[in-house]
UniProtKB/Swiss-Prot annotation:
Lineage: superkingdom: Bacteria
Classification of source organism: Bacteria, Pseudomonadati, Pseudomonadota, Gammaproteobacteria, Pseudomonadales
Keyword presence, Transferase: yes
Subunit text: Homodimer.
UniProt keyword annotations, A-Z: Aminotransferase, Pyridoxal phosphate, Pyruvate, Transferase
Cofactor: pyridoxal 5'-phosphate
N6-(pyridoxal phosphate)lysine: modified positions: K193
Chain's role: Involved in phosphonate degradation.
Catalysed conversion reaction: (2-aminoethyl)phosphonate + pyruvate = phosphonoacetaldehyde + L-alanine
PANTHER family according to UniProt: 2-AMINOETHYLPHOSPHONATE--PYRUVATE TRANSAMINASE
Gene Ontology biological-process annotations: organic phosphonate catabolic process
Assigned EC number: 2.6.1.37
Protein name per the record: 2-aminoethylphosphonate--pyruvate transaminase
Length: 369
């Protein structure tokens, strides 16, 4: 079994459609009115996905999703603020590292990698520390695929009069979040995840009042979202050279997103991908790290086979030779590997990928799963 181009079963970058790739074949002038209109249309469509046009601004930013996360924390958390960082995986730890590097006061609450943070945990922590001004949460922790209970946590944060910053990198566009029902100061996502664009830009949905009050907070010129938004509102342009081809690709990806049926349809396809993956991997005896109740249909983590003949690098290269790119594990306690359910892929392709995994395990003579 082989494919002409590898299928990326990863959480981003991921497999994109031919239409999305073709959109990058046109060169754009960064100051041209047509490109400014493209940016404005993009922000309008992104805001519509979370029903945020009345309450939030969409501020795009060049770079990886982590650039946008750092920009959001640096812009929206005052220099005398304090962040409660909720951690149950590598990307929660990255939030804490960002706060440390930025010089923002922070505390952490860490649960096991297979244990969601609960609203009760957050309530207790906020009651115990009145200095906390902001709470930072990973919606879907990409190191495992675990889904944290965002709506419940958001309500507790609001009840305490605090501000919520959501890293929705691996969930935005596939898992529903309504800005009029889930209170947040910032929700951060990126082009190369569930929207099926290419990597190269992030965007922050910032509460209008909070962004308006954020002048002078940022540690950085390039990552100042207040300045980025102000300049874009005044001129229609990005402050610094924009990733023009990435913007064009994301605009085209959003056209396809809406043609597919928007968030409900995207979620349904990813859920079907995840179900097909779990069913077929289960037939091979490969065990999911997470119980189904807390597994998001974004990326799945599997226990590595116990057989000493299994070595991930060899396994990875053999599966890649059959046309599929997997992802290494990112857990601290047990050996795992990960398979993404997102991107321009179908349940049938997920089954074909598992068939390739089965062939590889036989070739490696891995018997003890």
């Amino acid at each position: 079994m082989s494919t002409a181009a590898p299928i990326l079963l990863t959480p981003g970058p991921l497999t994109t459609s031919a239409r999305t790739r073709q959109a990058m074949m046109v060169d754009w002038g960064s100051w041209d009115d047509r490109f400014n209109q493209l940016t404005a249309s993009l922000c309008e469509q992104l805001l519509a996905i979370l029903n945020g046009a009345d309450s939030h601004h969409c501020v795009p930013l060049q770079g990886s999703g982590t650039f946008a996360v750092e920009a959001a924390i640096g812009t929206l958390v005052p220099r005398d603020g304090k962040v409660l960082v909720l951690i149950n995986g590598a990307y929660g730890k990255r939030l804490a590292k960002i706060c440390e590097v930025l010089g923002r006061s922070f505390s952490t609450f860490e649960t096991a990698e297979d244990e969601p943070t609960t609203a009760a945990d957050v309530d207790r922590l906020l009651c115990a520390d009145s200095d906390i001004t902001h709470v930072a949460l990973i919606h879907c922790e990409t190191s495992t695929g675990i889904l944290n209970p965002l709506p419940e946590i958001a309500q507790v944060v609001e009840q305490h009069g605090k501000r919520l910053i959501i890293d929705a990198m691996s969930s935005f566009g596939a898992l529903p979040v309504d800005a009029q029902k889930v209170p947040f100061d910032a929700l951060i996502a990126a082009s190369g995840k569930c929207l099926e664009g290419v990597p190269g830009m992030g965007f922050v949905f910032a509460r209008k009042e909070s962004l308006a009050a954020a002048a002078g907070n940022s540690h950085s010129l390039a990552m100042d979202l207040f300045d980025q938004h102000s300049y874009m509102k005044k001129t229609g342009q990005w402050r610094f050279t924009p990733p023009t081809h990435v913007v064009a690709a994301l605009h085209e990806a959003l056209l396809q997103y809406n043609e597919e049926g928007g968030l409900p349809a995207r979620h349904a396809r990813y859920a079907a991908n995840c179900q097909a993956l779990m069913e077929e991997m289960g037939k091979l005896g490969l065990r999911s790290f997470l119980p189904a109740a807390i597994q998001a249909p974004i990326i799945a983590t599997f226990h590595a086979p116990k057989d000493p003949r299994y070595q991930f690098k060899d396994f990875y290269e053999r599966v890649k030779a059959k046309g599929y790119i997997l992802y290494p594990g990112k857990l601290t306690q047990v050996e795992t590997f990960r398979v993404g359910c997102i991107g321009h892929v179908t349940p049938a392709q997920m089954r074909e990928a598992v068939a390739a995994v089965s062939e590889v395990l036989r070739e490696m003579e891995v018997l003890d799963i």
